[in-house]
Amino acid sequence: MQFEKMITEGSNTASAEIDRVSTLEMCRIINDEDKTVPLAVERVLPDIAAAIDVIHAQVSGGGRLIYLGAGTSGRLGILDASECPPTYGVKPGLVVGLIAGGEYAIQHAVEGAEDSREGGVNDLKNINLTAQDVVVGIAASGRTPYVIAGLEYARQLGCRTVGISCNPGSAVSTTAEFAITPIVGAEVVTGSSRMKAGTAQKLVLNMLSTGLMIKSGKVFGNLMVDVVATNEKLHVRQVNIVKNATGCSAEQAEAALIACERNCKTAIVMVLKNLDAAEAKKRLDQHGGFIRQVLDKE
């Protein structure tokens, strides 16, 4: 795909004179363009759903979810991966974010990093990629060599692969087994794909990781029942989660949480089934950690 023909590099007529308008009008132009992003994501929901099902199947079989990107795309993958352990109680290595240029590139531009095909392959080798894993390549342009090479290597190993880009028919889309391509159009600032394209990528990543966690039993109703209480706010949230799930008082919720070492799932089953902590945990273990199955089948 020729650089000048890429949609993400096109000129946006709506912002052609954005440097001449008032600050408020500037904000309106940006906001109006941002409004189009969820609609672009909506058009690819079937592709996102298919990717979630594949990711869940692989993770259920012992695999990992690996995000691979450069620049903004890489940072978004790292952001999504880093939020999974505290929100859903998963091990830090289950969802991994890799960025061209390594850790330094999270805050700084690393010259030439995204153009390194070798870097994409080596980063995957360094985390001992296996055929059980799913690699999600993220690149707004769809032409980033670091990402393309990583996807090619992953497919050679037998991994399932997903490509997220904002240009139709891109190399990332055609290299990956599953393509997710929200077409957001030209950016307000020409070529600044951290804007609409980045927003679209963030929305897609939200769905991928959240969908995985819901299907893995980490959500009951709409409650994050595996949240890890690492601060006072989350201690309070745990109490509210148990209250909302069971209808018990705050005092009952806190007592149950203390009895089970602050595991929301166990506390919820304790209250709803009138069990002690050991028996509640045993039943959850018997049903793979799914509260719904414990309640529905017993």
UniProtKB/Swiss-Prot annotation:
Expression induction: Induced by MurNAc 6-phosphate that releases the repressor MurR from the DNA. Also up-regulated by the cAMP receptor protein crp via the binding of crp-cAMP to a class I site upstream of the murQ promoter. Repressed by MurR in the absence of MurNAc 6-phosphate.
- Which Pfam families does the record cross-reference, listed alphabetically? GKRP-like_C, GKRP_SIS_N
Q: What does the record say mutating residue 115 to N does? A: 7-fold reduction in catalytic activity and 1.5-fold increase in substrate affinity
Please verify whether the record's keywords include Lipid metabolism.
Answer: no
Question: Per the UniProt record, which EC number(s) apply here?
Answer: 4.2.1.126
Would the keyword RNA-binding be found if you checked this record's keyword annotation? Answer: no
Biological or metabolic pathway of the protein: Amino-sugar metabolism; 1,6-anhydro-N-acetylmuramate degradation; Amino-sugar metabolism; N-acetylmuramate degradation; Cell wall biogenesis; peptidoglycan recycling
One GO biological-process annotation of the entry reads: N-acetylmuramic acid catabolic process
Quickly give the catalysed reaction: N-acetyl-D-muramate 6-phosphate + H2O = N-acetyl-D-glucosamine 6-phosphate + (R)-lactate
Phenotype when changing residue 114 to Q: 2000-fold reduction in catalytic activity and 4-fold increase in substrate affinity
Please give the InterPro entries that the UniProt record associates with this protein: Etherase_MurQ, Glucokinase_regulatory_CS, MURQ/GCKR, SIS_dom, SIS_dom_sf
Q: Which UniProt keywords apply?
A: Carbohydrate metabolism, Lyase
What does the record say mutating residue 83 to Q does? Answer: Loss of catalytic activity
Residues in SIS domain copies: 55-218
User: Which NCBIfam families does the entry link to?
Assistant: N-acetylmuramic acid 6-phosphate etherase (TIGR00274), PRK05441.1 (NF003915), PRK12570.1 (NF009222)
Q: What does this protein do?
A: Specifically catalyzes the cleavage of the D-lactyl ether substituent of MurNAc 6-phosphate, producing GlcNAc 6-phosphate and D-lactate. Is required for growth on MurNAc as the sole source of carbon and energy. Together with AnmK, is also required for the utilization of anhydro-N-acetylmuramic acid (anhMurNAc) either imported from the medium or derived from its own cell wall murein, and thus plays a role in cell wall recycling.
Q: Quote the subunit structure annotation.
A: Homodimer.
The UniProt entry, under PANTHER family, shows: GLUCOKINASE REGULATORY PROTEIN
Instruction: Specify the protein name.
Output: N-acetylmuramic acid 6-phosphate etherase
Name its species. Answer: Escherichia coli (strain K12)
The gene coding this protein? murQ
